[in-house]
Amino acid sequence: MSRTPIMAGNWKMNLDHVAATSLVQDLGEALKAAGYDSSKSEAVVIPPFTDIRPVAIIIDGDKLPIAYGAQDISAHDDGAYTGEVSGAMLSKLGCRYVVVGHSERREYHNESDELVNAKAKKVIENGMTPIICCGEALEVRKAGKHVEHTVGQIKADLDGIPAEQVAKLVIAYEPIWAIGTGETATADDAQEVCQAIREAVKELYDAPTAEAVRIQYGGSVKPANVAEIMAKPDVDGALVGGASLKAGDFSKIVTFYEA
C-alpha cells in the first residue's frame, strides 16, 4: 500500500494571529514556487488555538494546498471545563488533524496514556484525525528500553480504537531527547522504532491496518536531514517544530521528495 507522507508543522506556543497569517501566506507562496505536488506529500500546519481561524481564512480563501489542525483537544464534549476546547469546536473550525499526547503535554501537564486514549477517541468521534505522539526520554534510550517503552505507550493509546479507525490515523514517534535540542536520532534510530510501532499495530490488529497507518518521526527535523529520514521504509512523514516557523525551511521539508 502506498502511504502519502504527512509533513506537519507544530507551531507550539508561538506566533500571534497576525504573525500566523503572515507565515501561512509565505508558506503558500514558498510551496507554489517549489512546484509542490500534494500527491507526493501532505502539508499540514498545527497553530495555537487563537490562530486557527485566521489561518483557516487564508488557506480557504487563497485555496492553499495546506491542511490545518489543533495542538490539543478536551476529553469532554462540553460543560464547566474552563480553558478546555472541545472536538466539536475544532471540527466546526475545519480542523482536519489534532495532536494528542505530545511529549510536552505528557511532561508539563501530566497527561497519562489513559487520557491520551480518551482524547484520541474524541478526535475520531468528531470526524478528525488524531496524530498520536509517543517516544522515550534520554534515560530510557540509554537503558536500551526505547522500543519497549514506545510500543507500550502506543498499545495503551490505541486501546479500544477499532482497526478501521487506526488505519486512518497518524502516529508520531518523537524521541524526547531530540526535541528542540539540536540532537537528532539517526535515520536508522527512527526506522528502528517506527518499524517496531508498525509491528505492534500488526500484532494488535492485522497486517492491512499496519500497512495503512502513517508513522511520522519528530525530533529536530530540518531541510538538511529530512531526505535521509524519509528514505526509511517505515517513516511516513515528519512532525516538525522549530523549522516549521520559517516558511522557506518548512517548504523544503514538505518537498523533501525533490532532494
Curated annotation (Swiss-Prot):
Q: Name one GO biological process term.
A: glyceraldehyde-3-phosphate biosynthetic process
The entry's localization annotation reads: Cytoplasm
Q: Does the keyword Isomerase apply?
A: yes
Alphabetical UniProt keywords: Cytoplasm, Gluconeogenesis, Glycolysis, Isomerase
For this record, an example GO cellular component is:
cytosol
Q: What class of enzyme is it?
A: isomerase
Known pathway: Carbohydrate biosynthesis; gluconeogenesis; Carbohydrate degradation; glycolysis; D-glyceraldehyde 3-phosphate from glycerone phosphate: step 1/1
Residues given in the record as substrate binding sites? 10-12, 180, 220, 241-242
Keyword Plastid applies: no
Q: Which SUPFAM superfamilies match?
A: Triosephosphate isomerase (TIM)
Q: Transmembrane ranges?
A: none
Molecular function terms in GO for this entry? triose-phosphate isomerase activity
**Pfam families in the record:** TIM
Recorded catalytic reaction(s): these are: D-glyceraldehyde 3-phosphate = dihydroxyacetone phosphate
Q: What is its EC number?
A: 5.3.1.1
Where is the catalytic site? Answer: 102 (electrophile), 174 (proton acceptor)
First-listed, main subcellular location of the protein, grouped into a coarse class = cytoplasm
Q: What is the annotated quaternary arrangement, including any partners?
A: Homodimer.
Q: What does this protein do?
A: Involved in the gluconeogenesis. Catalyzes stereospecifically the conversion of dihydroxyacetone phosphate (DHAP) to D-glyceraldehyde-3-phosphate (G3P).
Which family does the record claim for this protein? Belongs to the triosephosphate isomerase family.
What name goes with this protein?
Triosephosphate isomerase
Task: Give the species this sequence originates from.
Answer: Cutibacterium acnes (strain DSM 16379 / KPA171202) (Propionibacterium acnes)
The uppermost taxa in this organism's lineage are: Bacteria, Bacillati, Actinomycetota, Actinomycetes, Propionibacteriales
Gene coding for it: tpiA
